Amino acid sequence: MVLSLQTLAKKVLAGQRPTKCHPHFLKCYGLWWHNGPMIFDQNQKKIWSPIFTDGVHINAALVKAAAENNYDLIKLFTEWGANIDYSLLSVNTERTRDLCRELGAKEQLKQEEVLYYFNTIKRNLTSSNIILCHEVFSHNPILETINRTKLRGIIYEQLEALMENTDILSELLTKYWYGIAIEFNLTKAIHYFYQRYVHLHQWRLMYALFYNNVCDLHELYAKEKIRMDMDEMLKWACRKNYNYLTIYYCCIVLGADINQAMFHSIQFYNIGNMFFCIDLGANAIEEGKTLALQKDKSFIASLLSINCYSMNDSLSLKETDPEVIKRMLKDYHSKNMSIAHKYYIKHGFNDI
């Protein structure tokens, strides 16, 4: 497409730092959005505005402009290279739909196209983008028209054990975006969800435990005073293998029973967690072996039959700062797992 002189001028002006441009000129050129200057980086194809402080891809910005029925920006973003078909994800009036058709949009998106655009937009893992995705998609009727099984599959990949058996799509999607914010520690987005969804405070605590996010766990438990039964917390920490950070925090910082953490790990068949608990001082080995046999987990019972496990004395049991805990356990390899592995290589487990 050949750009007009006016469009080129806007493109150049949008690439300048806002301090170099008088607000009057930005407003005249339509580069004032959300009560502040709008910036465009043509190399990254990203837009910044007061609500998009981390920047969003121009296609995502187009989705927002269409949702707001901002005709000037729909035209401008399309001229700057946005795919006009993305506007169909959020168009909500006939007048806006007619404009998008004039600019080349399809009559409607196919199911696979909706899912493709959905997956493409969410890839930009910034607070600005995840908040935008939540606002655009969590109550969007266009998602009601696509294959529910496929969409639930996408959500399950993120939530796993925290996926609820509900048909209320908006609830699932809210937790989906919230979960992404927690997993990738998107602090502005986390604060956004925390302020708006008070009923999800305990769910966020469960998510932090399950996804080994010790910083968020500390934030919720020590600072926000969010509470739940300690044994339930242990279960969520032990449910996913190699959750060393949240197991350490629960047992060493909060004082949860390390043997109980080992038992939960055995029940979930998470061998990495089990050995880490032994590293931390779990010593109810015979009880653990009995539990493994009761739960028909013979391989774990065989592992626990080796009589040479002990606490890892080199592992500090005094840390309470989540950042220090993260650094300490970043590349941690279990001492007792190494012992079991060497035994297996040398003897096998057939004779145990």
Curated annotation (Swiss-Prot):
<dbReference type="GO" id="GO:0030430">
    <property type="term" value="C:host cell cytoplasm"/>
</dbReference>
<keyword id="KW-0244">Early protein</keyword>
<protein>
    <recommendedName>
        <fullName>Protein MGF 360-9L</fullName>
    </recommendedName>
</protein>
<dbReference type="GO" id="GO:0042330">
    <property type="term" value="P:taxis"/>
</dbReference>
<comment type="function">
    <text>Plays a role in virus cell tropism, and may be required for efficient virus replication in macrophages. In addition, inhibits IFN-beta-induced IFN-stimulated genes (ISGs) transcription. Mechanistically, degrades host STAT1 and STAT2 through apoptosis and ubiquitin-proteasome pathways respectively.</text>
</comment>
<dbReference type="Pfam" id="PF01671">
    <property type="entry name" value="ASFV_360"/>
</dbReference>
<dbReference type="InterPro" id="IPR002595">
    <property type="entry name" value="ASFV_MGF360"/>
</dbReference>
<keyword id="KW-1035">Host cytoplasm</keyword>
<comment type="subunit">
    <text>Interacts with host STAT1; this interaction mediates STAT1 degradation through apoptosis. Interacts with host STAT2; this interaction mediates STAT2 degradation through the proteasome.</text>
</comment>
<comment type="similarity">
    <text>Belongs to the asfivirus MGF 360 family.</text>
</comment>
